[in-house]
Design a protein with these regions (language model features):
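A composition-driven surface/loop motif
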Residues: 1-200
């Protein structure tokens, strides 16, 4: 699948309960934006994939995202990723989930003009958390590699980060095995639907 939208999101979810995007085995998918976001309704669309609802990406295929303006993937609720290979280049945030970012597994190469992973909820201090159970992360960010307004929990995974300075300036850093835990955040016991409701 190859989708480019010169003036808005390549994928826009206006209203839904839960949304699943499945990367089929051996598939190579490319989504991009031309660099502008024209208003189509009251929502501030500002990413290649933009969802007002809970969004889950699963499967074992690959997804390449190029955001000449704005973010790579945005969910205004929970952003859940259970697997797949992701190459994201974004002018702003790479992955953004307002209520949470929850990652079970996957391979991530993200280059971003701000934070590579960003979760922030100004209205609810219990949300805005990042929970990562595992995966491989190669993050190059002008801001933070991983930023959360709430708790941050890294259970496992391999992390290589080059950051320009958000919460603090950083040099190249690589870490394998269990990461730091900032609190319980949400659970990762069951991929898919359960991931989106745990921690509520």
């Amino acid at each position: 699948v190859v989708i480019n939208n010169d003036s808005s999101a390549a994928v826009y979810v206006q209203s839904a309960d839960k949304v699943f995007i499945t990367l089929a085995p051996d598939s190579e998918n490319k989504l991009s934006n031309g660099g502008t976001y024209e208003a189509v309704d009251d929502n501030n669309i500002d990413s290649v994939i933009f969802s007002k609802s809970d969004l889950t990406l699963n499967g074992s295929g690959s997804l390449t995202i190029t955001a000449k303006a704005g973010h790579g993937i945005v969910s205004k609720d929970d952003l859940v990723i259970t697997g797949g290979t992701y190459a994201i280049t974004a002018a702003s945030q790479g992955l953004s989930g307002k209520d949470s970012i929850r990652i079970l597994d996957g391979d991530f190469t993200i280059t971003s003009g701000k934070d590579a992973l960003h979760s922030e909820n100004e209205d609810n201090a219990e949300k805005g958390f990042v929970y990562i159970a595992g995966g491989n992360f190669n993050l190059t960010a002008s801001g933070d590699g991983i930023s959360a307004s709430g708790n941050m929990t890294l259970l496992d995974g391999m992390y290589t980060m080059t950051t320009g300075g958000g919460s603090e300036n950083g040099k190249d850093h690589q870490e394998g095995g269990p990461g730091g835990q900032g609190g319980p955040g949400g659970g990762m016991d069951n991929p898919g639907e359960d991931l989106m409701t745990s921690g509520e």
